Regions:
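Hydrophobic, well-ordered secondary-structure elements that form the walls
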Residues: 336, 396, 414
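Mobile late-domain/C-terminal helix-loop "cap" segments
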Residues: 350-403
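Mg2+-dependent prenyl diphosphate-binding active-site environment of isoprenoid biosynthetic enzymes
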Residues: 92-348
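Hydrophobic alpha-helix feature that most strongly marks membrane-spanning transmembrane helices
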Residues: 297, 304, 314-317, 340-344, ...
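A glycine-biased, small/acidic residue-tolerant capping/turn segment at secondary-structure junctions
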Residues: 306-319, 349-356, 408-412, 429-433
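Conserved N-terminal diphosphate/IPP-binding helix and adjacent helical/loop segment
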Residues: 1-143, 148, 152, 157-180, ...
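Short, charged, amphipathic alpha-helical segments
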Residues: 224, 228, 293, 387, ...
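Charged, amphipathic alpha-helical oligomerization/scaffolding segments
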Residues: 67, 71-78, 82, 229-232, ...
Length: 461
């Protein structure tokens, strides 16, 4: 079951060279092919048939425990093979340029963080019968498709050329059609990416609908509650993204605003809601689900604060994104809002001048980015954020303990995962960067706050 472009190309005779009979458009497509559709890593290579897809799947909880990411990848592979076949039957060009790219992007995935959180929440809450396993894997697949929608659209909004170390979807489509007018190719790439994100969201909703239709064997009320969580998740994701781009456009970089955006865009969507979905599908009591939601919000905020630090200080080879993207795009991150607030509080004019000259400058040089790093360190913002990450992570683990989860081994796995997502990645220090020492505040200036604003504690309570 491989993606093929044979249906839209001239078929060469044995005595013809490759490409014979190609139209100019087909020649361009041959030079810039769309990605092939392969099985997930470790699944044995490209799809060869439905039997391979069936063999990858298991509704045995122990099998999923051993490789959550692999099980979710197999579920996605089967689901996406069907979706792409449907798209190909509808129109081969649409399938090749849009549907296959959505499938390829989703299957390559990232850390499969949301599926892992959902799964270990389900298991820690005592879930694990076959109906629950199937529902959890479908819900996890839907979360990954929702993430595809978010990332593909995000790259268009940010004009980001790279995602996960590869050309972003809109950039890849533009390159495929790039021998025409550059502006036309760029516009086509952006339009295709918007449609690709829409398609990913539609496929995610289809997957949840199928889950609910087969939900008779789930605990009483689980399907209804899962649907409510799903509806909330979608809206929170969009709201968080809007706060992000609106703050970027209007330069509203207050600390409270940054916390609110981080809560909606990352804490809820990335961590809290997957944990809640797992608890709901397991039939957990409402009190247990609430405790896990609190844990997820704390860990999710820590996750976003870590991401802010990584954008500025981590090795691009680790993150898969150019360093300093948030600064160049003028994103209203917590880290930059806190840096500015501390500079204002201490009367540090030099720091404010550096920030004013750098934030939102797409052409910011490496030297300019180093000056921003120096200011973030010198104001104490970097250390303050690291301290808050540690406190939020500890609070998240306490909430897991307070949930009194019935499965100790799965609960331990969940605690380990929550600790992992907010911890530093390898290569956290930017190569060659030597941070400056913090200067003494001017005489009479207000001392910087000893901790981050109350807003973090309020949303993470």
């Amino acid at each position: 079951m491989r993606f093929t472009q044979a249906t839209v190309r001239h078929t060469a005779r044995p005595d013809e060279p490759p490409g014979a009979g190609d139209t100019p458009q087909q020649a361009r497509e041959r030079a810039h092919p769309s990605p092939s559709y392969s099985a997930p890593s470790g699944a044995g290579g490209p799809f060869g048939g439905q039997d391979l897809l069936d063999g990858l799947l298991s509704d045995e909880p122990a099998a999923v425990d051993a490789d959550v990411a692999g099980a979710v990848g197999a579920t996605l592979a089967r689901l996406l093979a069907t979706r792409v076949d449907d798209a190909r039957a509808l129109d081969p060009l649409f399938a090749r340029d849009v549907a296959e790219r959505v499938a390829d992007f989703t299957l390559r995935g990232g850390r499969r963080l949301r599926p892992r959180l959902l799964w270990w929440s389900l298991r820690a809450c005592g879930g694990g019968d076959r109906a629950q396993v199937r529902a959890a894997l479908r819900a996890a697949a839907a979360l990954e498709l929702l993430q595809t929608c978010a990332l593909v659209h995000d790259d268009v909004m940010d004009a980001a050329a790279v995602r996960r170390g590869r050309p972003a979807l809109h950039a890849a489509v533009a390159a495929q059609y790039g021998d025409g007018a550059p502006a036309t190719a760029r516009r086509l790439g952006e339009s295709a990416a918007v449609l690709a994100g829409d398609l990913a969201l539609a496929w995610a909703d289809d997957t949840v609908t199928e889950l609910l239709a087969d939900g008779a064997d789930l605990p009483p009320g689980a399907a209804r509650r899962a649907h409510e969580v799903w509806r909330t998740t979608r809206t929170e994701m969009v709201a968080g993204q809007y706060l992000d781009v609106q703050g970027q456009a209007t330069a509203r970089h207050t600390v409270a605003r940054a916390v609110r955006a981080a809560c909606l865009k990352s804490a809820l969507y990335t961590v809290e809601r997957p944990l809640e979905l797992g608890a709901v599908l397991a039939g957990a009591e409402a009190s247990v689900a609430r405790a896990l939601c609190r844990a997820g919000r704390c860990a999710g905020l820590a996750f976003q604060l870590r991401d802010d630090l990584d954008d500025l200080f981590a090795d691009p080879g680790v993150t898969g994104k150019p360093s300093g993207g948030d600064v160049r795009e003028g994103k209203p991150t917590y880290l930059m809002a806190l840096t500015r607030a501390r500079a204002v509080g201490t009367g540090d004019r030099h720091a404010l001048e550096v920030l004013d000259a750098a934030v939102g400058r797409a052409d910011l040089t490496g030297a300019g980015l180093d000056r921003v790093r120096d200011v973030v360190v010198a104001t104490g913002a970097r250390d303050a954020v690291e301290t808050r990450i540690t406190r939020l992570s500890r609070r998240a683990l306490r909430h897991v303990v307070l949930a009194e989860l019935p499965q100790p081994r799965a609960a331990a796995a969940l605690r380990e995962l929550l600790g992992e997502i907010s911890g530093p990645r390898d290569g956290a220090a930017a190569p060659g960067h030597r941070p400056a020492h913090a200067p003494s505040p001017p005489a009479g200036a207000a001392a910087p706050a000893s901790s981050l604003p109350v807003a973090v504690a309020e949303v993470a309570r």
